[in-house]
């Protein structure tokens, strides 16, 4: 059998890590949303086989056990002792190593797809619990709707649709290693973020309040490795964005505007500065067009 799954990118409207657990893993408090910039993951099961293969349309990704989509297929195959191999083909559109959860989105798509093909009838909560063993962003990507994400990434609380807005996304040429950034958390004095205020603003559909309280505690760390982040933020604000910040561990920056005309102006103005620029909207759910 075969199936195709949409794998939307994610953005962090607010990101804080208040402490580390004893095993060194960060505790997260984040407000996340999926956006309509997506990879497309095509999944085919092969009877009487245990082989898992991954193909992509880019040379920048590993196609072996290091690929999160591979790990997702292996996880379900092993846990359920399924006598079927899995062929995965990923049509990449999400920038790689950008802080937008592309690999996690692909892994979540594989979990959702195999859940359907194999008639597992696992709930989102069950899939998200499994997903945490792959990467901390995969549980959110199973949901792919606006949510408060806490714990190690496994506690997903949907918070309803965002206020109407447009998002302009720009990725600097540099790429950033998430593990490298996370290793420096304990070495830095982080500016802790008002995550709950962002949640309240979204529930109240208060766009201005949301903009005032947005923030990313990892931004100062990544900026030291990628100074273009501050340049892009400044340009977005100069061109009319209501707010601008880095997503995840970076280096991607996004700006938001309530008006499509202003967002389009920001998008056009940045295209000469960055090679990868996108004009997108947030997704209320995986079925949002």
UniProtKB/Swiss-Prot annotation:
Reaction catalysed by this enzyme: 4-CDP-2-C-methyl-D-erythritol + ATP = 4-CDP-2-C-methyl-D-erythritol 2-phosphate + ADP + H(+)
Binding site for ATP: 95-105
Positions annotated as active site in the UniProt record: 10, 137
Pathway: Isoprenoid biosynthesis; isopentenyl diphosphate biosynthesis via DXP pathway; isopentenyl diphosphate from 1-deoxy-D-xylulose 5-phosphate: step 3/6
Recorded GO MF terms: 4-(cytidine 5'-diphospho)-2-C-methyl-D-erythritol kinase activity; ATP binding
Gene Ontology process terms (BP): isopentenyl diphosphate biosynthetic process, methylerythritol 4-phosphate pathway; terpenoid biosynthetic process
InterPro entries: GHMP_kinase_C_dom, GHMP_kinase_C_sf, GHMP_kinase_N_dom, IspE, Ribosomal_Su5_D2-typ_SF, Ribsml_uS5_D2-typ_fold_subgr
Broad EC category: transferase
Entries under SUPFAM superfamilies matching the protein: GHMP Kinase, C-terminal domain, Ribosomal protein S5 domain 2-like
Enzyme nomenclature, EC number: 2.7.1.148
Family: Belongs to the GHMP kinase family. IspE subfamily.
Function according to Swiss-Prot or TrEMBL: Catalyzes the phosphorylation of the position 2 hydroxy group of 4-diphosphocytidyl-2C-methyl-D-erythritol.
Record protein name field: 4-diphosphocytidyl-2-C-methyl-D-erythritol kinase
Organism: Ligilactobacillus salivarius (strain UCC118) (Lactobacillus salivarius)
Lineage of the species this protein comes from: Bacteria, Bacillati, Bacillota, Bacilli, Lactobacillales
Gene from which the chain derives: ispE
